[in-house]
Each structure stands twice: as C-alpha cells, then as structure tokens.
Swiss-Prot record:
Species annotation: Shewanella sp. (strain MR-7)
One Pfam entry name: Maf
This protein's name: dTTP/UTP pyrophosphatase
Family: Belongs to the Maf family. YhdE subfamily.
Any one cellular-component term (Gene Ontology): cytoplasm
InterPro entries, alphabetized: ITPase-like_fam, Maf-like
Record site: Important for substrate specificity: 11, 77, 159
Amino acid sequence: MNLVLASTSPRRKELLTHIGLGRAEFSFSQVAPDIDETPKAGELPRDYVQRLAAEKALAGLALCSGMSQPAVLGSDTIVVLENEILGKPVDEADAKRVLRALSGKAHTVMTAVALAKADQTSVRLVETLVRFCVLSDADIDAYVASQEPMDKAGSYGIQGLGGCFVESIEGSYSCVVGLPLVETRELLSEAGIR
C-alpha cells in the first residue's frame, strides 16, 4: 500500500512523519488536491470539517490513478467560536478581527482526518477546547505583523508564536496543529499501514 498525504501543509507533513516513529520503512508522498471549501447552507461545523477531509482524501485519490494501491489521507481543521466557523483570514484586518473575537474566550478546534482507498473512506473527528488569554491591541498587531496567522484557521498557530496566547487546552494538541496523531495512527493501522 502506498501512503499519500493530500496536503502541502508543512505542519501536517511533520506530524505524519512523527507517526512513523523514525522507521525508515514508513514513507509517504504528497499531492495537492483542489476542492471547493465553501460551507453548504445550514451545514454544521462538525459535518463541514468531516466532509472537507473526506473530499480532500478522495480528490487526492483521484490524483493517484497511476499508483499501485494508494491510501490517501485528507485532513481539515476549523476553529469554531459560538457556532461560527473561523477559517483562514482573508487579510490582516480579518486576522485582527478574529483574534479580537478569540481574546479571553474558549473556542473549539475541530480536525477531521479521512483515509480513502479504492473501496472505502473512513473519517475520524477530533475536538479540542482551547482557551485564550486576554489579548491587547499591541499583541494582536505584533502577531499579525509577523505574518504567522495568515495561513491558519482561526488566525493563529499554537505551535508557533500564537502559542503565547493559549491559556489552556482540553484535548489533543496535535488536533490543534492540524493532524490528530492518535486517530490518524488508528486509521492507518486499520488499513494495515504501520
């Protein structure tokens, strides 16, 4: 079986590498699927993130048509505050707006991971509660000026400078980074990939 990561995210690549525990025989390739990430009318955040992960895995599988027995991992992460999905910021003003909204509050990070093979697609959903400290305008301005939040759901990266804003988490740290390790290992194990 040939493992493929349907993502070009350096964070997901690094996390998937960790799953191999340094074994030389654990390897994977990457593809960049292109899907429409527009939420459907009335779609709940849990349903949305699971749908996107599955669609990414299936789109990645379609890109592997010449490969022998591909197994494709797709993943998607969203930040949810008061039932609103906070995606990647469209610009610096949007990033600042999102960070102000998160300031001093708890929000949920949802990451879904899907494994698609020729005959089936399996999906796991992981949710982690993240609590932010109160952020000053100066903190927000400096963080956005670093450009770190610009490609991240919820406008922050817990594994980088944005970790300074995290007061506590309840749940999976790797979920917040973008690929829940325990659940991904379970999916791979069930597919016979070790």
